[in-house]
Amino acid sequence: SYESWGYKHYNGVHWYPRISVYDSKFGWTKDQHLGREFYGNFGTFDVKLTFASNFIVEATGNLVNRSEVLPDELREKLDLKNFANKKWNSEPSVIIPYNKNNRKTWYFHAENVHDFAFTADPTYRIGEARWKDKVCYSLVQEPHASRWLNAADFGAECLKVFSEDFGEYVYHKVIVADAQDGMEYPMITLDRGSDPGYRDLLAHEIGHMWFFGQIGNNETYRALLDEGFTQFLTAWALIKIDGEFMIENKKTNWYKSKFYKPFKAIDSEIYYSYIKDATKQKDPVL
């Protein structure tokens, strides 16, 4: 958790006891979760999360009691487009006043997933974009709204590209959340930054939904199928959606604006990694 503009923010990850996976290769897996790779059993989750009534919550799975906790009238007030002209990092407005005696319970149901995560924040505002019967929701802290307007659209584009080229996404939604992080969990990604710099992060975390999310492979045993494959997917999506070159902020420095050359996505996301590892004397295990 952390605090911004006087409001508490919560990311609920690795928050409950998990049973070791028993698989055909290793039997009971004994790798300890040390804040990095993880491996879980597929199952059904029914989770009820109770927060103060001013919190907006999203999580793995289907929101069962949407009409109760997020009725249409409130959803319209929270729509990200309403805050398109909000000054960056300015004080958020109050949509739902805090009352210490009022609580809401958000009920999520998820089937055939191997983990459950959630995010909650009173300043979240909601964007939405669809591809076929899939939906990408963006949860954006209101002070960041002006530079997150295309997050849901970009996320839906990633779903389209990955589904058409690598096998269709099996779940009904994916979340991209403005959560000062860079991690993936079934149906939900916790992200940071702003457009256009966050594009590679969003593509990367959504890309994790393929091997990590839907197949649920042992990341410790086959690390290449986790970060390695996902880094390839990141470059693939950026090239398909934005073209050969990375979209970057306009250079305000005179020298850079005159001589700077944009990076190719394949270089930035794939090839330069080897250079960085060599110069930092790092050689990650694949």
What are these regions (language model features)?
Residues F108, S138-L286:
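Hydrophobic alpha-helical and helix-loop surface patches within well-folded domains
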Residues E3-W5, G61-V64, P122, Y221-E227:
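Composition- and surface-driven signal marking solvent-exposed, interaction-prone regions
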Residues A117-K134:
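Reverse-transcriptase-like RNA-dependent polymerase core
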Residues A52, P71, D121, L139-E142:
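Helix N-cap / beta->alpha transition motif
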Residues S1-A117:
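Extended, low-hydrophobicity, Ser/Thr/Pro/Gly-biased non-transmembrane segments
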Residues V47, C136-Y137:
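Hydrophobic beta-strand segments of well-ordered beta-sheets in folded domains
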Residues F38-N41, N99-N102, R130-W131, E168-V170, ...:
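Extracellular/periplasmic catalytic domains that process cell-envelope and extracellular macromolecules
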